[in-house]
Structure formats: C-alpha cells, structure tokens
Amino acid sequence: MKNPTFYPRLLPVLAFLVFQGVYAKTESLFLWPGKAPGELPGEVEKERSETKGGILRVSNVSKPSLTVFPAEAENANGMGVLVCPGGGYNILAYEHEGSAICEWLNSLGVTGFLLKYRVPRRKNRLKHEAPLQDAQRAMGMIRKNAVEWKVDPDRLGILGFSAGGNLAVMTLTSFRSRSYPKVDAADELSCRPSFGILIYPAYLVDRKKRDKLFPEIKISEDTPPCFFAHTGDDGVPAEGSVLMYLELEKLGVTGNELHVYPFGGHGYGMRPSDHPVATWPARAGAWMKAMGWLKK
C-alpha cells in the first residue's frame, strides 16, 4: 500500500502528482493484518481526505497505517520518531502536524514514522483507547523492522501535537502491557518510546480544574524523558505540560525540558510565526542532540 491517505479523486490531479513526486521514497503499510481491535462493521464511514482552511484533514480512519519517511542515507543517524498528528481525536491534521514534521526530522538525519491512527472517537470507548492500540502496535512494528528501516530500536521516540500529544503521553505511560491481544511477533517487542516530544498536548488536565493530571495519566520513574512546548494563550491549558514536567522531575526522571511561551495559540505545528514559539523545532533538535539521540 503506497501513500494510502491521498487519492486522485479527492485532490486535483496536479497536486496528486506533486505529492507522489515529493514523497516517492515513502513506504506505507497497514498496522493490522485484519480489522483493528474492537472495530465494528459500519461504525465509521469511508475514509476521507480534504483541505479546509489550509489544513489537510483526514477523517473516518478505520484501517490505521504507518508511513515511513526514511532519512537520506548520507545524513541518517539511525534514530526514529513516531509522529502523531492532532485533531481532537476526530480528524488528523495530516500535513502540518504530520508529513511536514517527518520532513523536518529527515533534515536532522532522523527517520520519521507517520501514524494514521483511528478517528473519530469510537462509541462506548475512551477517546484514546483505539488510537493507543494503534500507537503501541506501531512501536512494535518499527522495532520488528528496525534492520530493514535502518533505525536503532533503542533510539525510537514519539512526537505528538494536541490530541496526538495526548496519545503520545498515553503511549509513554502505558508501555508495560499491550492494550490488545497479541497479533504477531511485533507485539512481543517493547512499545516503550525512548523519549517524548509533546507540542501543546491536550487532555492532560481539566479545563476548569487545572491542578492535577487526569487519573489515566500514570507517570512513574520509568516514564521516558520529555520535551514540552506550549503557550500561555493556548485554549488547551499549559498547566498540563507544566504538571507533567513537575511530576517527571519529582519522580527522578532526568533530562526533561519545558518551554511555555507567552503567545502563539494552538495548532501552529511548524508554521512560520513572529512569536518565539516558532523556535520550538530548533529547541527540540538541540534537546535531542544534548540527550545523545542524534549521534551516528
């Protein structure tokens, strides 16, 4: 399955051809050999991709997939990062919080793995339940294919925006056991990320009562170190990032870095801005280098 999200019937032919040219080296594969765990027939309409307000939105995902963006051989350092776009667990902001991020990672010599997880939220299931299954499965698949994809399984991080940041947090804190029955050998490998990069992560605290993380977020001394970027004027409370940072430090997890910028709002991804928050990619890159993950 090549470039599964983009279809000529949904985009102008020229745009489709440009996409194929830009991402010709990517490889995509479904996460599950059959239907994904807990999926019900007819629960989700046919998958859609559309651009609204300059944002490429992917919706109605019932067959989650992983797209590999390999770093150029001469620049590759063996590190990999699983990228989780945001979208409120209802859609996926697939370009500016997805493929564009993988391109940035490639510029650092890092192989990006773009996760197309299940949306929208499933009835009678926690908002993150199906996406967490997809993320855990993806981590195992990357490690299983580490030799083929030329990545070090001990240098495999996770990066998420907004709801994708919440998904990254759940993956960072729920790695002791799989949230689904074992499928194959990939599920015998660890789904613990080496680190997390959390950009305006959502659903960490209640919007009104902001003094505690939600109880499903279980930080421990084994939680990987994290980089946080948030803004004070974000509708998603920055207290979530602050509280998680403090909890990590309290439990002796070292190497965390927190940035709370005054302005910038929400959903900016890596788009240019006059606000200092636009420097977060440089800060994150410097953090990864300082932590030793970018070494060849």
Range-by-range predicted roles:
Residues 235-241:
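Conserved alpha/beta-hydrolase "acid-adjacent" motif
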Residues 77-86:
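Short beta-strand element of the alpha/beta-hydrolase
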Residues 95-113:
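Short amphipathic alpha-helix adjacent to the substrate-entry channel of hydrolases
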Residues 227-230:
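Short beta-strand/loop motif that positions the catalytic acidic residue
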Residues 133-215, 221:
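Primarily recognizes the serine-hydrolase "nucleophile elbow" in alpha/beta-hydrolase
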